[in-house]
């Protein structure tokens, strides 16, 4: 019998109303469902939070609960709730994810996102110090045809336009190595954009297994071969990228801002 899990382990809710549900996605959680278990993705957890319990094997039989009830304090439903992610984050990236509960909200928010009217602020811990201390990286991205990793992209002149602004918050040292805390402002939303652009200027995100300089770390991770020594060299448990804030202006001129702090391991390493 699996142990009952607490509701606070299900979702970290930043804001909720009848149309929107904004959450703080933890590092290590994928956004979309996988074939492993019903808690392994953000979408599955959002459905459970809204009352749909896929843990139930039959009437009065929930695999996580000895008495057959859903282990979270939710009003149960047999209908799979609508879950639409307006923005998505990589598995190891933590932070703000904006989701909608109905089709009209999905249409409105999706339009704002496509038009670039939802502004995103990230925080990253990188190796080294960027020069200049603030700037705009305007470099197109496309498939990395020389990589063994199918999902890996790179800066290439025939790629899709991508722009990332950054600003140095401060630099600091750990064990004789210099790191920097950056505020990062992506103007476009390409796959792995921030990680690629920061690596391209010589400041890879700390803990990045794919763009940190040796993609064998990523291959060993997905193939279950990542050793304790490799994890030690990566320094942090996940790559140090956090979606700090989403901001947009509503049709009637009101500014909406959703924000959350980085996880404790991130804050501790950066001295925040």
Residue ranges and their predicted role:
Residues 88, 165, 243-245:
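Extracellular/lumenal ectodomain signal focusing on beta-strand-rich modules
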Residues 41-45, 193, 200:
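Short amphipathic alpha-helical face segments that pack within enzyme cores
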Residues 27, 187-188:
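Active-site acidic-Proline motif in GNAT/NAT acetyltransferases
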Residues 1-20, 26-30, 174-176, 197-272:
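Pseudouridine synthases involved in rRNA/tRNA modification
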Residues 182-185:
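Short histidine-centered loop motifs in beta-beta connectors
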Residues 109, 180, 190-198:
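Short beta-strand segments enriched for Tyr within beta-sheet-rich domains
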